[in-house]
Amino acid sequence: MTYEVKSLNEECGVFGIWGHPDAAKLTYFGLHSLQHRGQEGAGILANDQGTLRRHRDTGLLSEVFRNPLNLEKLTGSSAIGHVRYATAGEASVDNIQPFLFRFQDTQFGLAHNGNLTNAQSLKSELEKNGAIFSSTSDSEILAHLIRRSHNPSFMGKIKEALNTVKGGFAYLMLFEDKLIAALDPNGFRPLSIGKMANGALVVSSETCAFEVIGAEWIRDVHPGELVIFDENGITYDRYTDDTQLAICSMEYIYFARPDSNIQGVNVHTARKRMGAQLAREFKNQADIVVGVPNSSLSAAMGFAEESGLPNEMGLIKNQYVQRTFIQPTQELREQGVRMKLSAVSGVVKGKRVVMIDDSIVRGTTSRRIVKLLKEAGAIEVHVAIASPALAYPCFYGIDIQSREELIAANHTVEETCEIIGANSLTYLSIDGLIDSIGIDTDAPNGGLCVAYFDGKYPTPLYDYEERYLESLNEQTSFY
């Protein structure tokens, strides 16, 4: 078992709507609000009185639908859409969602955000039994399980399939007569339900998509829940009662847009609280606070308010460069860092700078930014990270492939500080992170998955277990 199976992983965004005459166009607008979750490909599938039509391609949403006819042909009152992040070698149209399947006398579409931890085993077993896969994505597995279930009822087949797949998943399934949303038993990925003024129902990876189409948030989908949208409205069902909230803490730290709310917590507010707590844990002297745009700006505000230091715009971002964390190869990441940021000499020259960032993954970005600030005249650069040290992989749907790619898994804080060229390095504590996010729940770790920081995974790792345990004894130098 190698980490190659991790190439099935994707951090994506899904959006669906039921009961609106312009369903596909509204899905386009909803996906536009989710573009930050993936820029490798996009697609929309619409249902027009039982006829399902789809358009998908690689690239940004605006590129995929550059020809307006591609959107106009997607008529109907319900639709689902997907924006995709792909790991290296996967950026082909075959892997772009939504997928479209035929089953008995019907069709259905499927869009998925997450990663299945038993995908390799399931796929091998399905292929032995004659299943033919048209993509390399783990998302296709659910459809084959539904097809091959012997449960007499169709909803029973879906529930059986959902209980068979393991890991992190937020699924949208569009049928001729219904739209179904399903969330994994730990709620690793966010998924929210909204309603429009005309009664149309919407479901989205993030609530920021509701604002752009004028929808009002109803509630989040619960772990282990199956939500059915049809001519009768909304039906809330469950496929399992063995649930425990463990939503991905990286949604609050990095992935989600600041104007989204997840589990009742506004992302911007959570990040500000992370920054304030980081200031309380910071032990060095400085003159100004500089946040790394854009996902660290909220934390920088909180740090500045708590510390009493001025929050300055010492770094300027080129808004037309993709985010480095979710670009698919190391070469592209390094090029991206060079292109996307500039230091403001007039702000940082002669100053002791606290550089606030949301995370350190490989160290490429931090090293380059510290160098930029010092070249611009900063006399000291103290790096303060508004999350704990990322020392363990994610197996539930984030592009953290292995421990060998994580600088904190291979070096002490002091060594990492030396490698990135900073004068000091401070990480937010795990308890500080949990308290700052502050989900109202009795679940362990405040309802968060913090396995990336402490290595304590809330579920079995299945196909990844053997290789992961081997990796704990391996070291990679970042010097």
Which sequence ranges carry the predicted segments?
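Generic beta-strand/beta-sheet core signal
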Residues: 111, 174, 182-183, 194, ...
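Conserved short alpha-helical segments that host acidic/polar catalytic motifs at enzyme active sites
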Residues: 1-223, 228-286, 292, 380
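Short, glycine/charge-rich flexible loops or terminal/linker lids adjacent to PRPP-binding catalytic cores
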Residues: 308-353, 364, 391-397, 401
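Secondary-structure transition/capping motifs at alpha-helix termini
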Residues: 131, 151-152, 283-287, 305-312, ...
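Phosphate/diphosphate-binding loops
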Residues: 160, 208-209, 216-217, 224-225, ...
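PRPP-dependent phosphoribosyltransferase catalytic core
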Residues: 162, 177-178, 214-220, 314, ...
